[in-house]
Amino acid sequence: CSLCSNSHSFTYSMVVENVLGITIPDRARYLRVIAEEIKRIASHLFNTAIQAHIIGFKSLFMHVMEVREMMQDLKETVYGNRMNLAANCIGGVKYNVDAELLEYMRKTLDKVEPQVDEIRDIYDTNSMVLARTRGLGLLPREDAIRLGVVGPVARGSGLRMDVRKDAPYA
């Protein structure tokens, strides 16, 4: 799907490079990780917005989508696409980041970070959110291990894991 599209070309490129013995430049590795992290933030914001919509918190849904839009604009500026980044290729990446683009990325993330902190605070403290989510969708730790879940689902089940750290891919 477009929410995780960069992950597909990222992993495909890594598999082919591994099979063919291709070592990519460090800069390309860093740029791949940057693309993946930008995509990940936008994807998590989208899922957070959908959760707000499902529990009937329309204003929070709109707010989170506005923050996500900043990430979508960032993706479009950096990669030329808002959804399917097409950032990776076998042997490297299809884009570069100059000082001006890097500054744009920093400024965007500096705007997004406090918004994400505010959204997190709403989810952690708002009585309506808590009333409509507390005790729902629980996945016991043992089931999470057995099912091999990762990411927010794993952390929500009490597993202190992050595949980016536990099994680095770049």
Please tell me what each predicted stretch does.
Residues C1-A170:
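Active-site bordering "gate/hinge" segments
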